């Protein structure tokens, strides 16, 4: 990521995908610190560390990892989105946060997972000082 950002123009923004970066072995907080001025959009996708820990990268592909359930929504995985969102807030990020999860809907019902992700994102964004306007999704 650093090499790409250092060799691309300042006008090229970064879509920070926390789950993909963590899956690839990157440090999400370090990426925010190093490239905050160019972050234009954030995907808040979580990872399941136990899936990564047993993945044989010499034999299993990215798609295999997805099928095994490596990704999930915030609040259901291993990343600390409280720290991630706070770091973004500390650097003045004011763009979109989009919950994303690539997972099997038969194993993880989409509406329930959307509720889990929404609840966690609202919790960490409020704690980081963001004002969030909602249209009622996820209300109890």
Where are these regions (language model features)?
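Histidine-acidic metal/acid-base catalytic patches
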Residues: 1-16, 20-140
């Amino acid at each position: 990521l650093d090499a790409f950002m250092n060799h691309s123009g300042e006008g090229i923004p970064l879509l920070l995908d926390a789950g993909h970066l963590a899956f690839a072995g990157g440090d999400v907080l370090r990426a925010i610190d190093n490239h905050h001025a160019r972050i234009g959009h954030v995907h808040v996708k979580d990872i399941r560390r136990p899936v990564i820990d047993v993945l044989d990268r010499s034999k299993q592909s990215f798609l295999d990892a997805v099928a095994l359930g490596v990704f999930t929504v915030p609040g259901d995985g291993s990343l600390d989105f409280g720290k991630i969102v706070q770091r973004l807030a500390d650097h003045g990020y004011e763009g979109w946060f989009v919950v994303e999860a690539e997972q099997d809907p038969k194993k993880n019902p989409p509406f329930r997972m959307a509720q889990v992700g929404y609840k966690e994102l609202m919790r960490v964004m409020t704690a980081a000082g963001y004002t969030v306007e909602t249209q009622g999704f996820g209300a109890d």
